[in-house]
A protein has these predicted regions:
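Core AdoMet radical
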Residues: 1-34, 43-59
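Auxiliary Fe-S-binding modules of radical SAM enzymes
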Residues: 32, 37-120
């Protein structure tokens, strides 16, 4: 997998796509900017989460929804990890209190993993 938290590192997706791997995934965490359009061809799984730190930057709900919609349209599984230290309402609180619901639902899709996937 590769981390893609800002648009300037989207080139990492192409690098990942060209590597031999059983499961290819993006970790969009901490998501600190709108990533815009994503080419998720041959990407199996997309994980999204907010930043958790004292000086955390907020993550906007529309950024998360855009990634979710693109993943669904392109056949990648979507996993929303958590809002981070700043909730969707802009309030700073613990990661646990901000939770992991997106539009009142949880998204915890994961690819199937078996011994063959892990060890070939």
């Amino acid at each position: 997998g590769v981390t893609v938290e800002v648009p300037s590192v989207k080139y990492r997706i192409d690098c990942l796509r060209n590597l031999p791997a059983s499961i290819r995934f993006l970790s969009c965490e901490p998501l600190v900017e709108d990533l815009g359009e994503l080419d998720l061809t041959n990407i199996d799984w997309v994980i999204v989460g907010g930043e958790h730190a004292i000086n955390a930057r907020p993550m906007k709900e529309e950024w998360v929804l855009s990634i979710k919609e693109q993943a669904e349209k392109q056949g990648a599984l979507f996993f929303f990890k958590q809002w981070g230290s700043i909730g969707r309402d802009g309030v700073y609180r613990s990661v646990e209190r901000n939770g992991s619901e997106l539009q009142r639902k949880t998204y915890k899709a994961m690819p199937a993993v078996n011994r063959h996937t892990l060890f070939g």
